Amino acid sequence: MARKKFSGLEIXLIVLFAIVLSIAIALVVVXASKXPAVIKLPSDPIPTLRMEMTYHTDYMLE
């Protein structure tokens, strides 16, 4: 019985599938643990920009 050799395209697709699968598993683990991927310490010297959207009903009444 002859052994099948994979073509270059098949090898590239297998590698791409493995990479996408590992990223998907990592995202599921991070989402399931509900822990942030990056933890900022209170002594972090980099300021954090917080943007908040507010809706003013006064403008909507006009």
Curated annotation (Swiss-Prot):
One annotated GO molecular function: oligo-1,6-glucosidase activity
Reaction catalysis annotation: Hydrolysis of sucrose and maltose by an alpha-D-glucosidase-type action; Hydrolysis of (1->6)-alpha-D-glucosidic linkages in some oligosaccharides produced from starch and glycogen by alpha-amylase, and in isomaltose
Residue numbers carrying Phosphoserine: 7
Transmembrane segments: 13-32
PTM-bearing positions, type Sulfotyrosine: 59
The enzyme's E.C. designation: 3.2.1.48, 3.2.1.10
PTM note: The precursor is proteolytically cleaved when exposed to pancreatic proteases in the intestinal lumen. Sulfated.
One GO term describing the cellular component: apical plasma membrane
Subcellular location, principal: membrane
Topological domains annotated Cytoplasmic: 2-12
Cellular localisation: Apical cell membrane
Family according to the record: Belongs to the glycosyl hydrolase 31 family.
Quaternary data: The resulting sucrase and isomaltase subunits stay associated with one another in a complex by non-covalent linkages.
Cited function: Plays an important role in the final stage of carbohydrate digestion. Isomaltase activity is specific for both alpha-1,4- and alpha-1,6-oligosaccharides.
Protein name, UniProt field: Sucrase-isomaltase, intestinal
Originating organism: Sus scrofa
